[in-house]
A protein has these predicted regions:
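Sec-dependent N-terminal signal peptides
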Residues: 4-13
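Transmembrane beta-barrel strands of outer-membrane/channel proteins
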Residues: 37-43, 66-70, 95-101, 116, ...
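Glycine- and aromatic-enriched membrane insertion/assembly motifs of diderm outer-membrane
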Residues: 45-92
Length: 217
């Protein structure tokens, strides 16, 4: 029974860890540091999650880093490697591999996440754009998962190097064997900082809301 519970927690936490803001193909840049942290809540129930990552650029295309996910009764630490290629304004491609370990089980390996990030402009000025994230998660002792997110976004420039970018999209399994979920939100850019407010599961009794912040130094 304990093993079944642990497997269920691992499945839920890996899906939650993926359900972040949209990721773009490019990496942070040579010698630069990228950081992101978020808090996820479901009003009406005691279900808080956090996700934090730091990534350091190695050249123009590579980055390496760590992440930490915490949820109800679970905590996972991961080490990651990321690659990004800006092909042109219309399409960019990136990939990431993260190996995650269970901090509550003596740092035991739990799951391996492979991600494909793509994005590009739709309009000539680049304000209207698309973004796609594909996630393949290989679990230790349970079924693997394959999911995809597609988003449309529009950047509204403001004064003093600021902007606001609303986005809307869908979350679904790769085989479309589960209900398609709607995700929406926006981020507010202040120079090298972004403030995020995101959400999904809007049609459920306890929707999920995400508040986050990231930076590049």
């Amino acid at each position: 029974m304990r093993k079944i519970v642990l497997i269920l927690i691992m499945l839920l936490s890996s899906v939650s860890a993926m359900a972040q803001i949209p990721y773009y193909a490019g990496t942070v840049g040579d010698g630069k540091l990228y950081g992101y942290t978020s808090l996820k809540v479901r009003p009406g129930i005691n279900h808080q999650e956090t996700y934090t990552t730091f990534q350091y650029g190695l050249g123009d295309h590579w980055a390496t880093g760590v992440d930490l996910y915490t949820g109800p009764d679970c905590a996972y630490w991961g080490g990651l490697v990321r690659y990004g290629l800006n092909i042109n304004k219309w399409i960019n491609v990136g990939a990431e591999v993260t190996s995650s370990f269970d901090l509550n089980r003596s740092f035991k390996f739990s799951y391996l996440t492979s991600a494909l990030y793509m994005n590009g402009a739709i309009s000539q000025d680049g304000r209207l754009f698309w973004c796609s994230n594909t996630w393949w998660v290989v679990h230790d002792g349970s079924d693997n998962t394959f999911s995809n997110y597609e988003y449309l976004g529009y950047t509204i420039p403001l004064k003093n190097h600021r902007a606001i970018t609303p986005m809307v999209g869908t979350i679904h399994s790769w085989k479309f064997d589960q209900d398609v979920d709607i995700a929406a939100g926006f981020y507010y850019t202040i120079k090298n900082w972004n403030l995020y407010l995101w959400g999904n599961d809007f049609l459920k009794s306890h929707p999920r809301f995400i508040a986050g912040i990231d930076f590049t130094l």
